[in-house]
Amino acid sequence: MRIIFAGTPPFAAAALEALADAGHEIALVLTQPDRPAGRGMKNASSAVKLLAQKRGFGLLQPPSLRQPELHMQLEAVRADIMVVAAYGLILPFSVLNIPKLGCVNIHASLLPRWRGAAPIERAILAGDRETGITIMQMDRGLDTGPILLVRSITIAKDDTAGTLHEKLGQLGAACIVEALALLQQGKIIATPQNDLAATYASKLEKTEAEIDWRMDAENIDRAVRAFNPRPGMHSTVNGISMKVWQTSVDIAETDEKPGEIVAIRPDGIVVACGKHALILKIVQKSGGKKLRSAEFLLGHSLHPHDRFESGE
């Protein structure tokens, strides 16, 4: 197939490479403009841009898809289909009708559950046991189009948003290759979504990243995994602001108040929560490196009954 591909992060780059390796013609790649990133805030290219340059694909980085000139460029490509994966820009309805077979999206959830911007993180936060990839035909709505193909995977107890992004990136790559092959063979039947079963995955807000120790330890543990690697859950104790990167739940009941340190153990700092306790295993002081709690405590004095501040 002759394809226009639109995507930005590594999740999308995996799909682009798989499509090219499967023999499809990548006629044009769209990705977001370079943006400041890292400590130096220097302009950085997206994973999709780097791959497109490496493979010699035609590349455009428009700030918006609403310009008439861009529509003319897309029409001139005469693509069979447009594949969209974590692009980050809204596709106007007029663009959806440009390719012969329209536009399909690689969405990182089991639609109609978790439509929207942060399906991977919201699945972890909700304690979902499985997630997956949905290949869907794009329409006017937000992830509302007919389903072409679905594949699921189990969410492991130690999965973070980062590890799940990697797993789903590989699954998404395999799924889009499979879906296009079935489409070419006329073996796909588009299935409408059940709107009554839809849930929405709103983007993560910074206000959600402050630990509220009044919550159940299990819920905080999920939040730590969902916010890893970005933006990272954080809390403050004895004036020390730290991010918490890895935790586990201690189901023993405690009499301490939420946020109060119950014990300092070889496996981590045990903190009381609204229910049960949380073991902080890997932490990072503001401006410092990620450290196992035992290493962190070599340079910072924390004791039982010291209390973390609680976000609300």
From Swiss-Prot:
Annotated EC: 2.1.2.9
Catalytic activities: L-methionyl-tRNA(fMet) + (6R)-10-formyltetrahydrofolate = N-formyl-L-methionyl-tRNA(fMet) + (6S)-5,6,7,8-tetrahydrofolate + H(+)
Gene Ontology molecular-function annotations: methionyl-tRNA formyltransferase activity
InterPro entries, alphabetized: Fmt, Formyl_trans_C, Formyl_transf_N, Formyl_transf_N_sf, Formyl_transferase-like_C_sf, Met-tRNA-FMT_C, Met-tRNA-FMT_N
Keywords: Protein biosynthesis, Transferase
Record family assignment: Belongs to the Fmt family.
Name of protein: Methionyl-tRNA formyltransferase
Species: Nitrosospira multiformis (strain ATCC 25196 / NCIMB 11849 / C 71)
